[in-house]
Structure formats: C-alpha cells, structure tokens
C-alpha cells in the first residue's frame, strides 16, 4: 500500500480514505506513524452488515479476541506520543450484561496499554427498552488509551475559562467567593492547632491571598485540621495531604489559573437517525 506511505510522508491536511479490512489495512502502515486513532467497532451481536465482519462472532470471547488483534496493530502503528480512543458498547446474553468494554480494556492494560480515562458518553436518550425487569441504558464507554507516558496532550486548549478574582469592601475575593475571612476565623478559634501552627497558618493564608490579588492564582481552598474534610483519605499512608495536615495542621488546594479541565462524563446527544435508510459509522 504505497499510497499510504506516500501520504504519511506529505504535509497534506486533506484526508485520505482507505477502504478495506481494518486488520489488513493496518498491517500495511509503518511502525510509529499515526498520531491518533479513533474507532467505534460494531458491537457484538448488534448489527448485521451486508458483508459480514466483526460483531457477528458466535461468542463474546471470539469477538474480544478479534478486536484485540486489531488493537495490537493500532499499538504498533501509533506514535509514542499518540492517543487511541475506543468507543464500544456492551451486549446482553442470557439476561446478563457481559461487560465487553471492560473485558477489552483490561486485556489491553495487560498488553501494555496505558488507560488514561474511561469517558462516559451520556447520550441522554436511547431506544425504547422492551425489557420489563432492568433499566434502560443511555451511556457508552469511550476509552482514552496511550502507549507511552510521554504522550501529546494539549490541556490548555480544552480548559474552561476561569472566573477572575475581585475586590469587595477592600478585601480580595477569589473567583468562587473565598475571601479568607472564614478561614481566618476558623484558625483563630481552633482548639486543634497549637499557637505556632495558628501563626504559620495565618501567615501562609495571607501569602495566598496576596497571590490571588496579584493574579498569580484565581482560586483556592484551605483545609484546616478538624475543620474541613481531608482530601481523598485520612490515612497518612495513602494521602500526602493527610500527612501534611497531621504535621502542619493545614494545607492549601490551588485551582489552575488557566481554568478547569473537562470531566469524564460527556453529554452528547446522538444524531437523530429517524427516517434514515442507512447507518453510517465512519
């Protein structure tokens, strides 16, 4: 497939469409040549295509094995900086949900893939469920895989624009309304902090408020011993924050001044397929 090799060597932004069996086509790509791969293969026993293909296997395991053969080739052609997005839905057999997406994902992890996210695609709507004894399903898994820990990820381009700090009644207020007054009061009245810890906490809080005023940071939270819940865990073996709280009596959580990252639940309503004669899965 010299046309593929020639296309990869160019700087063209026009897409090249290659038609064929995915496994056979991928085998003709050179190693480490693709920046990103996105696919949504036919789900098991969900759709009958004219030319057959994946998804019509006799068993879930056979389907998973066939998928993993393709995934192996994706890993080979993907650059170390590249990403692989896999959207896959689940199926039922003998009344049980089979867990096919996670069976595939766990096997990929065993094969050396790095799973960065399981993004939940919340479709908001789905087909009418004829089943009287279980809930309808309106979500699918969208796995974000990489094959190297040094992958390309342009975080700043997808952040939500942060709100700005402001001054109210002579006091600087963070983007979400934190002025430090409540924290100062908690420090002063605390029976869990020593006099030295109170002094250090107040000093550090004033420095943080100064950073807010200068625009260096836009928002923060302060956790004070026995005043706020410890982040993640109270165990000093499991949480560095818990150890900091035990040793110092307080710690700070800072918001990224460039904004927050999107979460791992994406609300995307599928294209309306009513009155269509064909199903397109590019």
Which sequence ranges carry the predicted segments?
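Core catalytic lobe of class I
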Residues: 2-282
